[in-house]
Amino acid sequence: MSLVRQNFHEECERGINRQINMELYASYLYLAMSQHFDRDDVALPGFREFFAKASEEEREHAIKLMRYQCGRGGRIVYQDIAKPQTTEWASGLEAMEMALKIEREVNESLLALRGVANKNNDSQFCEFLEGEFLGEQVSDIKKLAGYVTNLKRCGPGLGEYIFDKETLQGGEK
């Protein structure tokens, strides 16, 4: 038993392990998306870079959760990371819609985890989730929803190319 463990319920520990797996899955999916857009027959470098950064961000989230788990005296249980259901996307719009779906699922999972922390009176864990994850999720979902809207507006082909060039490569924040 860990000497630092205090007021850290096993249900919270299990939930963190599930969330770590979900964050790593999202990272893996975004990495697949990044590589798809790097292909010579797709050639959208803005999408490639956007999804590469998203992959790294999700990996960092997993590491943050691992460090928190260890800091609270919990143990990390490594699980298989599911492979992405697809590694090909018909368009940037399709990939952004999938990214939006994944971010919403991650947000739902984090909210459920916050509920577990609250149920077990773990105010430190609640504060950690709110400060490190939940606000960022809302911002990311908003940004992705805007990208989906604009990609629908500009259409495939030249419109998608211009979106890649002006929005993703153009430094829009």
UniProtKB/Swiss-Prot annotation:
Domain of life: Eukaryota
Predominant location category: cytoplasm
Subcellular localization: Cytoplasm
Binding-site list for Fe cation 2: E58, E103, Q137
GO biological process assignments: intracellular iron ion homeostasis; iron ion transport
Ferritin-like diiron domain boundaries: 6-155
The keyword Cytoplasm is annotated on this UniProt entry: yes
Catalytic activity annotation: 4 Fe(2+) + O2 + 4 H(+) = 4 Fe(3+) + 2 H2O
Binding site for Fe cation 1: E23, E58, H61
Keyword list, A-Z: Cytoplasm, Iron, Iron storage, Metal-binding, Oxidoreductase
Family assignment from sequence similarity: Belongs to the ferritin family.
Subunit structure: Oligomer of 24 subunits. There are two types of subunits: L (light) chain and H (heavy) chain. The functional molecule is roughly spherical and contains a central cavity into which the insoluble mineral iron core is deposited.
Name the UniProt record assigns to this protein: Ferritin heavy chain
